[in-house]
């Protein structure tokens, strides 16, 4: 009824969800880093999003992968997308604190067995 007569949509493909054990070193590292920063973390058994994470987490590769980050932003890939550069609220990380969070994550990753 509506739209363009010369456009045809073919649905196909797709990929499995990204699933990682909460006992993996990667997830333990993420949780430890958030705890050190005093940030509350939420674990989701599956990651949604626009990346084929199962390419890495499913056989035959089977390595953990996940999303990590501190700081605040919203509106990803939209005209009103933003990321907080400098925060006046000590409970909300800006760019510098987010960068330090990544550095701490890498140190934690090296330390956690």
Give residue spans per PLM region.
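Acidic-enriched catalytic cores of C-N bond-cleaving enzymes acting on peptides and small amides
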Residues: 1-6
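Preference for short coil/turn "hinge" residues that link or interrupt alpha-helices
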Residues: 11-13, 40, 75-76
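Active-site-adjacent substrate-binding region
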Residues: 18-69
